[in-house]
Amino acid sequence: MSSTDTAARTASDSAALRAELDITKLHALPSEQQDLYLLTFTSDLVQHISGLEKPQVSAQQKFLKKELFKILTLSSPTITRVVRNNLGRCFGAIFSKGDRGILFETVTDLLGLLNAGKHEELKTKFAAAHCLGEVFAAAGESVFAQAGAVISSLLKLLKNASNHTGFRGSIFAVLRKVVVGVGIPVDESAARDIWKQARNAATGDKSTFVQVHACRCLEQLLNTTPFFDNANDFDHVKTVTLKVIDSPAAPVRHAAAACLARALAKLHATEAAVAPMPKSKKAKRQSKKPAPRPGEDEEEAEVSESSASKRPESRLFFLLPDLLRQLSTQYSRSGTSNRARAGIAVCYKHVLRTLGVKFVQERYGEIAGHLLFDLLNHPAVTYNRFRLLMTRKFVKSILEDTVGLESLREDSQLNAARWLINGVLKDYPQVIQERREPSKYTLTSTLSALSSLISSLGSAFTALAEPCRDALLQVLPHPSYTVRIHAAHCLRSFVLACPHQLLSCVTIALNSLNREIGQLSTPRQAPRRCVGYANGLSAMLSTSRLQPLYGSVEVYSRVFAQATDLLKTSSNSELRAASTQIQVAWILIGGLMPLGPSFVKIHLSQLMLLWKNALPKHLGKENFAQRGNLEMSFLAHVRECALGSLLVFLEFNSKLVTADGARRIATMLQNTVGFLDDLPKQKSVTDISQRLHPSLQLHDLTTMVQRRVLQCFSKLIHVHPLSHGDVISQTSLLSLAISSFAEPDSTQSGPLESSITASTAQFETLWDLSDNFAFGLTGLAREYVHVTLSGRHQNDNGPAWSAVESADQAIDDSVSFENAL
């Protein structure tokens, strides 16, 4: 035993000798090498302490403290951020691993450096303050008696740090660690002093670093002390955070959102906690105050409203509806910027995370109802197209990511899906007069949330298969295109999770489609209903290749025959009815293309003939002179539909594309380019009777055809690389691509565009032009935008340009992309 002790003591002594700083050697080095020497020494010291056992740390505490203070009091070189962080790690490791015999002495010595006169350099005080924060984070409960003195000294240093941004921010970071580390609420006067300084810094300081740490300091005061749970202080923190949340910097928005979320979550109370208040009713009867106007009582719910109360400040509580309304009211104000809305969306997420998993599971219906009905349907949101899309994205992130994936488990996910089906989808169309029909905005986000839950549950969703199938098929023919597409996507997720429902869903949708096609000549909304059923069928049929055991070749052949019959009989129909028949036929054919070469090969010759007929060689500009706007729109519409199915064919059947087939497809695409080149540049048509679709002009359809042509060209080149030279040399692909975004007259000038051009300073972004494509900018560039903003590719797990990537990056990206425009 004695030999072992001697060996351990020898190893300990040698380690101590290696950890000793040689100041003479340090100062003998050239000035440019002194920083590197000090950095290397402190890094080695961190590794040395991390490798020691608890008894070894206790044995070396005094020596290590001496070495650390030797570095803190160096006149040169300057203590950099990395060295400062290393010193803090050393102090934290010493008191978290070893005993705390020298803890009081260490805090006193660090306080002495903080309180030193002007003769002590600011960098030394900066390092001492940082080390104090690490000491309190590791062992603050053992020195809570000194917390008041430390807080007082740190607040005094704020005045001296007016010209040092990093020091100001670090002071608030240290104050936060002191408040958290002591383990008990700090003195109220000290807390009030921190509260005042942090509020002023959050709103008055221009540094984002200081603002972030000031907001985090406020958040910890709200979390660990009971002094600010009243109406007056809540109004103060709400005013501060809503002002800061409009910052262009995402970290500042997140810090302000977390602070406001902490305040709201701490003031949250269940009905059980608020209900038993008999005295408040009596006081309310005796009150002579006028009744509040509608909406004023929505701001807050106080437990006691008695004016005769002797307490100067009443305890404040929020029920869940009032708590959520605090956020939605501010979000829906017309003066709230999009950056502030993004911050409020992050605040929603923080509130739900703070309330806890169990609470969110129990109150999913109220939370989802607030977001889907109250927030999405507010006039301030629906009035502005970009604001609506942004809000839909925020609701998607909150409901699907924060709630659906983070909080809900399998049972609660099933309950949530049941609520979405019974509480929203089954109310369309309206059946009971007392239950309002959900708007298209509500239905869109509901279908998106349900699709996410179905994908997460997988085969466990079978318990809700029947009601879900009926609800989705009921929503599928909705008048809104957005709702129809989301319903089709949800049906795709549904049949993937419940493959035994595939054939029944396809059969029901196909029968409904045949019924609606027979009523195309009637005044009811049959065209939209037909396209809705076709999109649903296409989405469901495309899943057959993933689960072939549940499909049926007979059904596939029946659908293909139905599509070809529609193309053949469309020539006998009226123009608008024919356009619907053609669109439905090509959508169905596109849905069959994912079945792969085994099915498509049988019908390949017939498909090539159909595409050739739909994409013929154009006869020239003289031919257009005899056609009106309606007929030209029809020709563009036919080409866009045919190109859509051709694109899906190239995606899933590349093995069938031979060199001859590639040339034939390239010829069809070149024919379409010629058609686009000869289309006349017409202005917007106000006569609805001359439009193929009420909401689409001819130039809108032209843009859609251009998109499909470029997509098909791009896919063809990737599918058959040997045709690169032929495609580029024999077609005008490059001129089409360049003219799509470089041609000055590519956009058609209408009354709205002309008025905007005359007042260019009155709109914020290109989205306000309402030209449906923001002057050619497209979401297809999202990968480039993502790399530009975050510094990493989509599937890259390496470090990004930013050391800390936000957990709510989707919300930040939406605001960053808008600012880029």
Each model region followed by its residue ranges:
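A generic tandem-repeat structural signature
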Residues: 76-147
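Helix-rich alpha-solenoid scaffolding regions
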Residues: 59-105, 382, 386-408, 412, ...
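Structural signature of alpha-solenoid helical repeat scaffolds
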Residues: 33, 56, 75, 79, ...
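HEAT-repeat alpha-solenoid elements in large eukaryotic scaffold proteins
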Residues: 34-52, 79-90, 121-135, 164-179, ...
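N-terminal "cap/leader" segments of large eukaryotic alpha-helical scaffolds
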Residues: 2-55, 69-70, 74, 815-817
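Flexible loop/turn segments at the boundaries of HEAT repeats in alpha-solenoid HEAT proteins
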Residues: 11, 15, 50-61, 95-104, ...
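Long, compositionally biased acidic/polar linker segments
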Residues: 33-36, 40, 308-342, 346-425, ...
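Amphipathic alpha-helical segments within extended alpha-helical solenoids and repeat-rich scaffolds
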Residues: 15-21, 58-75, 100-120, 147-163, ...
